[in-house]
Amino acid sequence: MSPTAGLGLKSQHYAEALASDAEGLWFEVHPENYMAAGGPRLRWLEAIREKRSLSLHGVGLSLAADADPDPDHLAALKTLADRFEPFGVSEHLAWSTHRGAHQPDLLPFPRTRAALDRVARNIERMQDVLGRTILVENPSLYLPLTGHDLDETDFLIELTRRTGCGLLVDVNNVFVSASNLGYAAETYLDALPAEAIGEIHLAGHGPDEGGSALLIDTHGAPIAESVWALYQRLIERVGPRPTLIERDDDIPAFDVLMAERDRAHGMLTPSAASRL
């Protein structure tokens, strides 16, 4: 079956998601929102899973932290994955915990060789517990850090080589980082090996409300035309990949998100584009 486009599943859209008859539609959820023994969220997810494929996109394992992944979190993730059998599981190349304290954000780190060893070890631990390979997502960056030993693309490629993991390419993150740090998004994307790319994310960004020239990865706006253009260029090079429309803030009506999803779906399946 050819790769298709999906939506990030939001609780206000459960009923419409369940009722939708869109061709090839799948949904992605943050597993942290479903790590419970029961309740209405899990019941909705079970009903939707009976009709649709799912993927799990984690935000809490802190793969770049200077400690092993939380074993309780990993165990809960495995329980959820075993229950819902997602076609993919992914996490971010970032850290959010330090010495037991949790930060409410996905934070960058110097890409040193020691960090490469640490992240690779944490990915291997995650994959061993889950019994499957995972995808790792590129971050969005705002300010340059010092102390790097490797470019970000080289760091990601080496992670795939060492651990067998794949890449989740967030095209909006690439655009935002390239704009903020002054490099070419096209060059970054061209450096990623096609065979490693397992999924693509598309999302919106906006200006810094503080008045700086920075772009912020808000997940709270429509996908920019510049990001759509990068996406088209990427799939022309690597071929179709499962593609997710992400919206986590200022969430519009289901049909508004479905319009973006249908656009991506048409780009993945040119024969469908003429019917949109």
UniProtKB/Swiss-Prot annotation:
Gene3D superfamilies: Divalent-metal-dependent TIM barrel enzymes (3.20.20.150). Pfam families: MbnB_TglH_ChrH. It comes from the Bacteria. InterPro entries: MbnB/TglH/ChrH, Xyl_isomerase-like_sf. NCBIfam families: PRK05409.1. Belongs to the UPF0276 family. This is UPF0276 protein Caul_0757. It comes from Caulobacter sp. (strain K31).
